[in-house]
């Protein structure tokens, strides 16, 4: 084995990176780049600004981190083996889990979009509870981060869902990190700071943003603000995606819908956010109201899932299968 290969194998943390002073390492940690993984997926420009270091130094650090993690071209077989390690969180409905090939995936952003009352927030509450279940019961024995942009989080709902599953209510509440985002800049700052939280607490396995577009839509109205809005939203979504991929976390975002006046047949509603929202989430699920407590979930876009739809129910106990 060459000395170079041996040296790469010995790099386990950012403190092991060759030629990087402790002063620079401290700056990286203070900026939230505390692991090789976060450095490897950073852009030189962002790292340079965040840590207050020269661009050339940022480029060198990123290259060293990528070399240490052996980031390279992989065979399809290697990718398949990595996909086998993706974990899933049960939604509480076997039908909905079946539509999603087992549940909500880690390392992926899943978007639920639909009209008011279609079940988006109910799913977010349920998944924040279910992620805490042991793997044999459909969870990941993990914690959740809940970013609430519309003030719709209800601890009473969490309590009902936890009680129905026989879980200790106080423990369930204590395993959900909650924050209310008051505007777009606050929402973006929260996600930027999340990197530090999830690196310190590896038990976090779910991040919820409910809803991801409401502040952007309110603060950047009209076509004259569209370019700025989409640019900020795109960067925000990619930051969430990086967290999912680097820390093996499931990211759930909810989104609103709007009517298209130029649609004369079919469903006239489309998700807010335009092409930015069409392309960033790995899985897109549309939710619709049905009779009573029944809701319809339809796969709109997912590279590994066939098109299809199922019916599930919103019950007092939480998300469940709809009765025949």
From Swiss-Prot:
PROSITE patterns: RECA_2, RECA_3
Source organism superkingdom: Archaea
A molecular function GO annotation: ATP-dependent DNA damage sensor activity
Keyword Oxidoreductase in annotation: no
One biological process term in Gene Ontology: DNA recombination
Binding-site residues, ATP: 114-121
InterPro entries per the UniProt record, alphabetical: AAA+_ATPase, DNA_recomb/repair_Rad51_C, DNA_recomb/repair_RadA, DNA_recomb/repair_RecA-like, DNA_repair_Rad51/TF_NusA_a-hlx, P-loop_NTPase, RecA_ATP-bd, RecA_monomer-monomer_interface
Keyword terms, alphabetized: ATP-binding, DNA damage, DNA recombination, DNA-binding, Nucleotide-binding
Stated role: Involved in DNA repair and in homologous recombination. Binds and assemble on single-stranded DNA to form a nucleoprotein filament. Hydrolyzes ATP in a ssDNA-dependent manner and promotes DNA strand exchange between homologous DNA molecules.
Family of the protein in this entry: Belongs to the eukaryotic RecA-like protein family.
Name by which UniProt lists this protein: DNA repair and recombination protein RadA
Lineage of origin: Archaea, Thermoproteota, Thermoprotei, Sulfolobales, Sulfolobaceae
